[in-house]
């Protein structure tokens, strides 16, 4: 989302969010909310009172489950850490802190406003308020990073970590300054082999501290510490995104059709549309049966627990899933068997269940390209 110069009117944006929330949730009042996730930007810059209004409004429209997970993403600046207790009072139950790295020079190049020491202090503060419900985000594969430096940083973060870690490999998006710098050879990232070693080091070090690797980039100390919200994405559940650039996947109650929607990215145009017509949706597209099947496999095999044939055939319980063939008929079985023999996939029965091995999870994108018709 593009934020206009001079900042935004918090009250106006909150009212736009509430309008979009009402329009989006009203058709689903027979459901319950399993999770709410404030992310995609820096939601911790919002006023806690406005976060509370959004949670209360959502709960009035579609009741929150008794054990609903309500996460807030935050950067560990002193201003945001100072609001942590107020966010808990507003209804936040889980706190996700974007440490990224402990290298202060890299944080400066990223434009981050915190130091590595402040990142660790924020984790300690969050643990006191959200014990067992704190996640730390770290990144690897950036310029100048070495395997030994990554191992040292991760060991230090693990000394402070609570129950969940998200460890992301740096991705370079086309059109970004980093993309242009790479093409001009002004920046050199670690070689692919070095980044693979960093990934393997993360699995090793987290495992030694009791963090189970349950998804490509995610580690949890117990099943209860896994991100309920993100698991919803990977398991093909319905989600509704509110706000500029937000994406949604849900089944339309009227037609039974699975839909994909994207909100308008420009924050001013999005807010104006919300106030005038109740939502800022820019695109709506029906997801056909072929795409729904592909998504089920792509998302399901991002998890170490994988995908069962029953889950695949059930789909999202919408009309596009009716009559879906078994996994063994959908996938290229010759290639699946080869990856099983090579130790990248594991399966039971006649593909009653399919999952990546730890080794396979590291190269799952190339495996998916090979087994999906």
Regions found by a protein language model. Give the residues of each.
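Short amphipathic alpha-helical interaction segments
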Residues: 321-341
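A short, conserved structural fragment
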Residues: 337-351
């Amino acid at each position: 989302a593009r934020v206009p110069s001079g900042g935004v009117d918090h009250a106006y944006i909150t009212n736009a969010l509430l309008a979009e929330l009402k329009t989006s949730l009203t058709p689903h009042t027979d459901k319950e909310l399993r999770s709410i996730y404030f992310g995609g930007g820096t939601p911790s810059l919002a006023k806690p009172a406005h976060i509370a209004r959004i949670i209360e409004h959502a709960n009035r429209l579609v009741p929150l489950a008794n054990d609903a997970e309500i996460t807030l993403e935050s950067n560990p600046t002193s201003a945001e850490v100072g609001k942590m207790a107020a966010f808990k009072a507003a209804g936040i139950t889980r706190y996700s802190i974007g440490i990224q790295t402990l290298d202060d020079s890299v944080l400066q190049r990223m434009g981050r406003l915190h130091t590595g020491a402040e990142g660790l202090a924020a984790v300690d503060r969050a643990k006191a308020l959200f014990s067992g419900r704190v996640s730390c985000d770290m990144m690897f594969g950036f310029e100048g990073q070495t395997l030994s430096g990554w191992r040292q940083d991760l060991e230090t973060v693990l000394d402070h970590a609570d129950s969940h870690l998200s460890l992301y490999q740096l991705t370079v998006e086309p059109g970004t300054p980093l993309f242009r710098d790479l093409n001009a050879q002004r920046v050199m990232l670690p070689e692919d082999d070095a980044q693979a070693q960093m990934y393997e080091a993360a699995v090793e070090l987290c495992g030694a501290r009791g963090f189970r690797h349950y998804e490509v980039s995610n580690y949890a100390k117990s099943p209860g510490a896994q991100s309920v919200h993100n698991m919803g994405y990977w398991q093909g559940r319905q989600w509704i995104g509110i706000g500029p650039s937000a994406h949604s996947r849900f089944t339309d109650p009227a037609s039974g059709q699975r839909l994909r929607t994207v909100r308008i990215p420009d924050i001013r145009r999005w807010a104006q549309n919300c106030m005038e017509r109740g939502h800022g949706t820019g695109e709506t597209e029906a997801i056909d049966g072929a795409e729904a099947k592909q998504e089920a496999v792509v998302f399901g095999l991002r998890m170490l627990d994988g995908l069962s044939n029953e889950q695949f055939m059930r789909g999202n319980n919408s009309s596009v899933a009716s009559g879906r063939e078994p996994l063994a008929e959908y996938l290229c079985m010759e290639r699946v068997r080869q990856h099983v023999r090579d130790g990248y996939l594991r399966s039971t029965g006649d593909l009653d269940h399919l999952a990546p091995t730890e080794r396979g999870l590291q190269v799952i994108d190339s495996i998916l390209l090979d087994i999906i018709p």
